[in-house]
Amino acid sequence: MMIEKQKALEMAISQIERQFGKGAIMRLGDTAKLNVEVIPTGSLELDIALGVGGVPRGRIIEIFGPESSGKTTLALHMIAEAQKIGGTGAFIDAEHALDPVYAKNLGVNIDDLLVAQPDTGEQALEIAEALVRSGAVDIIVIDSVAALVPKAEIEGEMGDSHVGLQARLMSQALRKLAGVTSKSKSIVVFINQLREKVGVMFGNPETTPGGRALKFYATIRLDVRKVDNIKQGNEIVGSRTRVKVVKNKIAPPFKQAEFDIMYGEGISREGSILDLGTALDIIEKSGSWYSYKDIKLGQGRENAKQFLKENKEIAEEIERKIRENFNLAYNKIKSAPDAIVE
């Protein structure tokens, strides 16, 4: 009886996959069996939480969260990772707030970065579509959905009512964009803010602007939150960030990743290596001392991170072991000479 039920279930699953594509249904315990091409996110923990080692090509991604939580930092890291493997990145700056010096600190080659500062939401989305259609751009970041103001609203009077205009614009644009993106190798990343729904008594009052279309069309939705400050003495030097994968169509969702974002330099690779290395017992921690094999890395987390920063070979050796443990590809990270701003 059980075998028959199992057979019937397998048949139903294979029929669903034939009709709606691989990954339309999966067991939560499954590891991602999809063979997808990815671009790393710049955070080892997040690559692991996504289940496939990064963000998948030919898909739409949404990164949302409160202000100053690290959304743009994460998106810029994705551009830097795409450039490291020889790709091209584009940044559609609807907020007119891109800081080139900060982008350079994160490892983005700003000389090769394509930047657009569109006047209207329509223009921003048409530029994105044209770049995807070209097939020559690996990652396109749109910052942010809230700043994609429809032309009618810009040209209208101050007090005019424009209910639902932005949602309609997003819905129309995403229908086209989703089609061309899925046939391409491009990743389209939308950065979104959070809004409070008025008068919500039960459930989550938080919502994202731009209507519901993006929630449907996004393959992956990442909820980015600042958890804590990172201090050195009395000085705040960074923030501990938590990213929750609230939607994932290519691997089981609801996984979480925590990592350090250091002010002025972005996601701390050394912090990730230290945390994951300790969790996997590759790095030993006794009291506040961290050690690897017979090498003392330092007392306290920040000191151990500094040691790994100065001793790149040891950091790379530990990272390789972590990646092997999670079956992630290892790209030797070259620190580009122009990626360091004194």
Curated annotation (Swiss-Prot):
Gene3D superfamilies: P-loop containing nucleotide triphosphate hydrolases
SMART domains xref list: AAA
Keywords assigned: ATP-binding, Cytoplasm, DNA damage, DNA recombination, DNA repair, DNA-binding, Nucleotide-binding, SOS response
Subcellular location, principal: cytoplasm
SUPFAM superfamilies documented for this protein: P-loop containing nucleoside triphosphate hydrolases, RecA protein, C-terminal domain
Subcellular localization, as worded in the UniProt entry: Cytoplasm
GO biological-process terms attached to the record: DNA recombination; DNA repair; SOS response
UniProt-listed InterPro entries: AAA+_ATPase, DNA_recomb/repair_RecA, DNA_recomb/repair_RecA_CS, P-loop_NTPase, RecA-like_C, RecA-like_N, RecA_ATP-bd, RecA_C_sf
Pfam families xrefs: RecA, RecA_C
A GO term from the CC aspect: cytosol
Residues the entry annotates as binding ATP: G65, P66, E67, S68, S69, G70, K71, T72
GO MF annotation: an example: single-stranded DNA binding
Membrane spanning residue stretches: none
PANTHER family: MITOCHONDRIAL DNA REPAIR PROTEIN RECA HOMOLOG-RELATED, RECA
Chain's role: Can catalyze the hydrolysis of ATP in the presence of single-stranded DNA, the ATP-dependent uptake of single-stranded DNA by duplex DNA, and the ATP-dependent hybridization of homologous single-stranded DNAs. It interacts with LexA causing its activation and leading to its autocatalytic cleavage.
NCBIfam families: tigrfam_recA (TIGR02012)
Family according to the record: Belongs to the RecA family.
Protein name: Protein RecA
Organism: Caldanaerobacter subterraneus subsp. tengcongensis (strain DSM 15242 / JCM 11007 / NBRC 100824 / MB4) (Thermoanaerobacter tengcongensis)
Gene this chain is encoded by: recA
